[in-house]
Design a protein with these regions (language model features):
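C-terminal motif of bacterial Sec signal peptides marking the signal peptidase cleavage site
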Residues: 19-22
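Amphipathic alpha-helical segments and their boundaries
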Residues: 28-47, 104, 180-194, 293
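N-terminal Sec/ER secretory leader and immediately downstream segment
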Residues: 33-147, 290
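Bacterial signal peptide processing site
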Residues: 24-26
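A cross-kingdom marker for long, charged
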Residues: 224-313
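Extended amphipathic alpha-helical interaction segments
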Residues: 146-256
Length: 313
């Protein structure tokens, strides 16, 4: 099994959206009622998903063949990375309490329960491995311990990754449904107000990222969604939405940045322009991603979500 480190930004939007649902008078009652439950699921997911992917990469990075496992003769041996204790705690009691909350969410609760269980199992396996490697027992047991730990640890990683994909899909679907219901309610009561544009920009931006975050993006679909997103931004600008509001201005600039980076990537796809050597090196360095890349689009989306979260406080 090999598993590539991936970005996990899309669920981040839901922390803002669920919070907004809880504080807006015109939010659908179901959205308000279930906000605490969803927030607990999101908090757990956002807290452990990325660290676990990084943990996995750290663990297999020094092995010649992760499928076969360690031989005990490698150099640069590392224990798997750990998850910060407060993030571990977020997937414990708060998650259990959320699972017990009513009304139940049949499409989401079983997925969340599996995610919690598999994270707990994996975290225990990681803890066992970390103690073994930190003691450097492999220097005295001819690597027998690392070989014994490897298969159960890799199985736990794989089970968690599968649960993570299911959790992300379930959270995304729940949020898409909730957001659209709220957008419809706001438009009915207020028209296309700042709140309406706020949620709409987040939703259309997310759709744009999803179209582009693919090894082989559909060019026509990407161009269509980019035009839709740009049209929404232009409509808000012409309506003078958020005029004079500094925080809206920050979010607006983040939204424009997402449009710009997405446009660059669409153009790269259209012209079939590969990354040049300097862009490839920049991408591999893990620093600021070069323009016209999936990573740059995702980073721009994360910035938009960050600005949206700040507006909600």
């Amino acid at each position: 099994m090999t598993h590539q480190l991936r970005y996990v930004p899309l669920a981040a939007a839901m922390a803002f959206a669920a919070l907004l649902a809880g504080c807006q008078k015109n939010a659908p009652a179901a959205a308000v009622e279930g906000a605490d439950k969803i927030n607990a699921y999101i908090t757990c997911f956002n807290g452990v998903e990325q660290p676990i992917h990084e943990s996995y990469q750290q663990y297999i990075g020094w092995m010649q063949d992760p499928e076969a496992g360690p031989t005990g003769k490698e150099s640069g041996i590392h224990a798997p990375g750990t998850v910060l204790s407060h993030h571990v705690d977020e997937c414990g009691t708060p998650m259990t309490a959320a699972l017990a909350q009513t009304p139940a969410k049949p499409e989401l609760d079983p997925v969340a329960k599996t995610y919690q269980e598999r994270f707990t199992t994996l975290n225990e396996r990681i803890g066992e491995a970390v103690r073994y490697y930190d003691r450097e027992d492999y220097l005295r047991d001819d690597g027998k311990g690392m070989k014994a730990l490897h298969a159960p640890l890799m199985q736990a990683y794989q089970a968690f990754f599968e649960a993570g994909e299911a959790m992300n899909t379930a959270l995304e679907h729940n949020e898409d449904t909730r957001r659209q219901a709220q957008i419809d309610a706001i438009e009915k009561e207020e028209g296309r107000s700042a709140s309406w544009y706020h949620l709409k920009i987040i939703g259309e931006g997310k759709q744009l990222v999803q179209v582009l975050d693919n090894d082989t993006p559909d060019l026509a679909a990407a161009q269509s969604q980019l035009a839709r997103y740009q049209g929404l931004l232009e409509e808000a600008q012409k309506a003078k939405i958020g005029q004079g509001d500094a925080m809206w201005g920050h979010m607006e600039r983040s939204a424009d940045k997402l449009a710009r980076e997405s446009g660059r990537l669409v153009e790269r796809i259209r012209t079939k322009t590969p990354l040049n050597k300097s862009e490839q090196m920049l991408l591999e360095s893990g620093s600021m991603p070069p323009g016209g890349t999936r990573q740059a689009v995702l980073a721009s989306y994360n910035d938009l979500i960050d600005m949206s979260n700040r507006m909600s406080h």
